[in-house]
């Protein structure tokens, strides 16, 4: 009997060889840790950043709307218009002097500055500054009156939340508006009562 045939019969099915790439490739690891709190913290941080940006924008808008800031911004155009007005007036006086002495140069002088236009711009800047200063004075007077007749701080932000735990803190803006409306209505009622009483007295006489 051939021994090679026994060896062939006893040998099993050929085994598959595993490539070294398959042996060395690591299996993907699943992420661990609670995923819930992280998005909540990110949302909270984003909300805080948005609130800070809104507050900065409101502060910048308030600074732009401030009357004193507008007056300061008009100082540059006022100086420039004043300089142009004086220069154009000097040029006009020089031209008139030459015309009176019959020495007018018929040659072209290029662009001749208009005195009336520069003077109008100068007066426009002065009017704007005067308007802003008067408005600032009226705001200060109203602030003094409100502090005298309604002693108490008012929140600077119109939609600022009111802290209920601090009753001595500043009153919210809507409450302040309602209080002002009540005061105005009371003053109007007193005025109407005095007028009706004066009319009744005059009719009785």
UniProtKB/Swiss-Prot annotation:
Disulfide bonds: none annotated. InterPro entries: Mediator_Med29_met. Residues 28-38 have a biased composition (Pro residues). It comes from the Eukaryota. Transmembrane segments: none annotated. It is found in: Nucleus. It holds the Pfam family Med29. Its main location: nucleus. Component of the Mediator complex, a coactivator involved in the regulated transcription of nearly all RNA polymerase II-dependent genes. Mediator functions as a bridge to convey information from gene-specific regulatory proteins to the basal RNA polymerase II transcription machinery. Mediator is recruited to promoters by direct interactions with regulatory proteins and serves as a scaffold for the assembly of a functional preinitiation complex with RNA polymerase II and the general transcription factors. Belongs to the Mediator complex subunit 29 family. This is Mediator of RNA polymerase II transcription subunit 29. It comes from Drosophila virilis.
């Amino acid at each position: 009997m051939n021994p090679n045939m026994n060896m062939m019969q006893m040998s099993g099915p050929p085994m598959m060889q595993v490539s070294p790439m398959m042996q060395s490739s690591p299996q993907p690891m699943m992420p661990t840790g609670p995923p819930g709190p992280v998005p909540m913290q990110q949302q909270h941080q984003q909300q805080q950043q948005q609130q800070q940006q809104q507050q900065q924008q409101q502060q910048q808008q308030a600074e732009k709307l401030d009357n004193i800031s507008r007056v300061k911004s008009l100082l540059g155009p006022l100086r420039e218009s004043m300089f142009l007005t004086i220069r154009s007036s000097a040029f006009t006086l020089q031209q008139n002097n030459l015309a009176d002495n019959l020495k007018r140069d018929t040659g072209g002088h290029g662009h001749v500055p208009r005195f009336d236009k520069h003077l109008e711009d100068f007066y426009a800047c002065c009017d704007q500054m005067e308007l802003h200063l008067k408005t600032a004075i009226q705001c200060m007077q109203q602030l003094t009156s409100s502090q005298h007749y309604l002693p108490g701080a008012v929140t600077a932000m119109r939609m600022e939340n009111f802290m209920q735990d601090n009753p001595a803190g500043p009153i919210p803006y809507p409450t302040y508006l309602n209080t002002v409306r009540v005061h105005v209505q009371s003053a109007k009622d007193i005025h109407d009562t005095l007028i009706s009483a004066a009319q009744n007295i005059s009719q009785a006489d």
